[in-house]
Every structure is written in structure tokens, then in C-alpha cells.
Design a protein with these regions (language model features):
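Right-hand nucleic-acid polymerase module
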Residues: 1-79, 87-153
Length: 153
């Protein structure tokens, strides 16, 4: 069901501004290189989906910054994951596809082609009602490193 049709016209502008602001913020976090769409063979709860995704990232994508959104499945119970990855060009997308498929289910792992890809991602998945999202910035991408200076510099 598209709840947008139940939003008052005056509030639609505010909702659109929120989507744009979220897209700008996510884009500012890192130069995203890969976008993923990851499903589960079973009806994963939001917590199970998040746990499995984070476990996959820890085991297979150590040192990779990522932003993810958990979204309800449209045609059945359960959740699936959409994510953006950075600092991952040394990883084989084909190998990662196989690892996810063998363990969890169907997936798509594609390169990010433009800023619009990130904005569209946010509009479609992150700002939906009922979506749950998270971010992990690693190493130099972490905000604590942005303005870091040694004492005495």
C-alpha cells in the first residue's frame, strides 16, 4: 500500500525534502562504490536480517564502510537488506554474490554509477515507513578522523 496518497498535499513537500536531505546526508558519508540488494530464503525478522547482514560483513567484508537499510518484503513476511559499500574494490563481487547466495539467498551486488543511484536508494528504501537502517564507517571514514590533528601541529 502506498501511504503517500494519504498524506496531505502540504505535507508532501516536507516528505520530499526529507528524502532529499537523507540522500544528501548518506552521500556525504563516503564515496559509495557498491549497492546491494540481499534477500533471505526464510522469512527473516528485522533483527535476524540485521544480525545475518552484520555477521556477513564482519566475516567477508572486514575494513569496508557500509550503510544499510532493512525493508519489509513486499510479497511475503520478513525483511531483506539494501546496502551501500565503500573501500571494497579489492573484493570480488562475484565471490561475494556466491557467498551470500549459498548462505542466505538471492541477491544483487552492483557498482554505484552516480550520485543519483545513492539518492534513488534513499528515496526507495531508507525513508520508507517501517524501514530500519544503520551505518558503520571504518578507519579514515569514521567521523572522529575528519578533523584529527596531532597535539602541537
Amino acid at each position: 500500500m502506498n501511504i503517500a496518497r494519504y498524506i496531505e498535499p502540504a505535507d508532501r513537500v516536507q516528505a520530499a525534502e526529507l528524502v532529499v536531505a537523507m540522500g544528501d546526508w548518506v552521500h556525504s558519508l563516503a564515496p559509495w562504490q557498491v549497492i546491494t540488494h540481499l534477500t533471505f530464503a526464510w522469512e527473516a525478522s528485522v533483527w535476524s536480517a540485521e544480525r545475518c547482514y552484520l555477521k556477513f560483513m564482519k566475516r567477508n567484508m572486514w575494513g569496508v564502510s557500509h550503510f544499510y537499510a532493512l525493508e519489509e518484503n513486499p510479497g511475503r513476511d520478513g525483511f531483506h537488506v539494501h546496502s551501500l559499500w565503500c573501500d571494497c574494490l579489492s573484493k570480488s563481487r562475484r565471490d561475494l554474490w556466491r557467498r551470500w547466495f549459498d548462505r542466505y539467498g538471492r541477491n544483487r551486488i552492483e557498482p554505484v554509477n552516480s550520485r543519483d543511484d545513492v539518492s534513488d536508494y534513499c528515496a526507495k528504501y531508507v525513508t520508507k515507513e517501517g524501514a530500519w537502517w544503520g551505518v558503520k564507517l571504518v578507519g579514515q571514514r569514521h567521523p572522529a578522523f575528519k578533523d584529527f590533528k596531532l597535539v602541537g601541529e
